[in-house]
Amino acid sequence: MSKRRVVVGMSGGVDSSVTAWLLKEQGYDVVGLFMKNWEDDDDGEYCSTRQDWIDVVSVADLIGIDVEAVNFAAEYKDRVFAEFLREYSAGRTPNPDVLCNAEIKFKAFLDHAMSLDAEMIATGHYARVRERDGRFELLKAFDHTKDQSYFLHRLNQAQLSKTMFPLGEIPKTKVREIAAQIGLPNAKKKDSTGICFIGERPFRDFLNRYLPTKPGPMKTPDGKVVGEHIGLAFYTFGQRKGIGLGGSKDGNGDPWFVAAKDIASNTLYVVQGHDHPWLLSRELVAGNVSWVAGEPPADGFACGAKTRYRQADAACVFGGAATGAAAAGPAGEARFSLAFDDAQWAVTPGQSAVLYDGEICLGGGIIESAATGQPGQATSAGHAPALAEAR
């Protein structure tokens, strides 16, 4: 009887390496697949692709599996990076890892793996898949400190039915122990924290290679000009560092934060104090929705939600089509609203709002706007909250 073939996405890191070893130990026919998805600066100081491939080959030799490299750079640029730039140009702050998972790791990679006669694919993500009553559920990882279900919330039933997450039941500390015990050459390699497939580099410098600067005024909520920004695309909601107001004599001495953008006037609004009302939101609207089960929760469903990675689930109520918030948008896309029990800090357009029912990840959408802590005011990528000077 032939062994079941599993193709493992191997990055050269510890997690995917241990994933491949675990599956080999469990008796699977394991094939490693290294994805090359970025080519713009292969010889640059921040590109680790060459060393990552060397690490993959070394690990494959040690555990005794075949490995190959596949180039998805064109797919990545078309499906992920182009959207990444469009979102930043529109003043939003996208999460490319979410789109990369849906379009590259679990679409282009999955398709290629199936062409290699694989029954399943596996990655080193910290999450779990559970089959129940003929349906597949995406669950949080056993190690909640490493849970990556937030980045995987756009996976559908077809993708989950072919996916294994061997590390979902294992704490990260144990993964490191396994790597050391079996003598993996990359056992002490640090975890990657850079943009998906682009690596760790000064982000503003990287973005400026593709988007031009466009200076404009930096204002307070009452309309006072306190500085100049280099371009709205280079700032994100809640940002504190890199604003350029650290030595400013304006204000009360509290730290400054980015609070809103007005695309029409090219104005960046900043506020002082971590808990300023312009930074706090109890409601949001999200579009470009995706549900793991293929359908949304019931209107009025009480759930938890994350508006950024590693955030604790925030209690909220889901508003579907019955509330009017999920009505079709300009492009015919569904929307949903979330009403939170407690105010959320710096809810950022372009980021994902991901819903949970306990351990189960339900799916989510891309944040379009959020109501601020001040009644009747909201902030989106293109509009600041109602200004004091306009009252």
Curated annotation (Swiss-Prot):
GO terms for cellular component: cytoplasm. It catalyses: S-sulfanyl-L-cysteinyl-[protein] + uridine(34) in tRNA + AH2 + ATP = 2-thiouridine(34) in tRNA + L-cysteinyl-[protein] + A + AMP + diphosphate + H(+). Its main location: cytoplasm. Residues 95-97 are annotated as: Interaction with target base in tRNA. It is found in: Cytoplasm. Disulfide bonds join 100-196. It is an enzyme of class 2 (transferase). The keyword Ion transport does not apply. Its EC number is 2.8.1.13. The active site is at residues 100, 196. Keywords: ATP-binding, Cytoplasm, Disulfide bond, Nucleotide-binding, RNA-binding, Transferase, tRNA processing, tRNA-binding. ATP binds at residues 9-16, 35, 124. Pfam families: tRNA_Me_trans (PF03054), tRNA_Me_trans_C (PF20258), tRNA_Me_trans_M (PF20259). Residues 146-148, 308-309 are annotated as: Interaction with tRNA. GO terms for biological process: tRNA wobble position uridine thiolation. Catalyzes the 2-thiolation of uridine at the wobble position (U34) of tRNA, leading to the formation of s(2)U34. HAMAP family: tRNA_thiouridyl_MnmA. Belongs to the MnmA/TRMU family. This is tRNA-specific 2-thiouridylase MnmA.
